[in-house]
Amino acid sequence: IPGNRAIAYSAKSKYSRIKITGIAENAQSKVGDEIVVAEALLNQVIAEAGISDHFIVETFIGSELAGTICEHPFKGQGYEFDIPLLAADFVEMDTGSGFVHIAPGHGSDDWELGIANGIVVPDTVGGDGLYYKDVPIFAGIHVFKADEVVINNLRDSGALLANGKITHSYPHSWRSKAP
C-alpha cells in the first residue's frame, strides 16, 4: 500500500455498486456503506466481507470507470495524492474484487501500466527490504513484516472491507530472499 499509485480494473467486465444493508457481527464494513465490485465476484466478496444483506444500486461496464479518481486510504498521513483508476487487461475475475492495487515500483505489470499512464514511480524499499526512512507510517519496516501495519492502518482509516491470507508474488531474490 505505501507504493500504491493507481487501481486497475477490467474495461470489459461488469461491475456493480452495492449499498450494504446488513452485516455480520465482525464485519469491517458498515450498514449504509456503498462499494463497487466486479459482478462476477460479488457473491464471493459479500461472503468474505461478512455482508449479510445489500441491494444493487447500479450495474455498469468497467470502461465507465475511466477518469475516476480515488483518495489514497492513508490520506492525511503523508499520502496526499490522487489514485487514478486505470483499465488493464491483466485484471482477472477469478478472485478478489475485480480491482488490482498498482504499485509501479513493485511489479512488472504495475510498472508498465504506471509508465504508460504517466504515473510517478516511487522509490520506497531499499535493497535490504526495509522501507526508506521517508516513507510515511512504514519507515524502517521490512516489507515482509508490514502486513499488520497495513491492516491496522486500513482498518483505522475505514478502508478495510475484509482481510485474510493470500499468496501473492513479489519481486525478490530467491537466493537471498531480499526484495
Predicted regions located by residue number:
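Intrinsically disordered or highly flexible coil/loop and linker segments, enriched in small
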Residues: 79, 159-160, 179
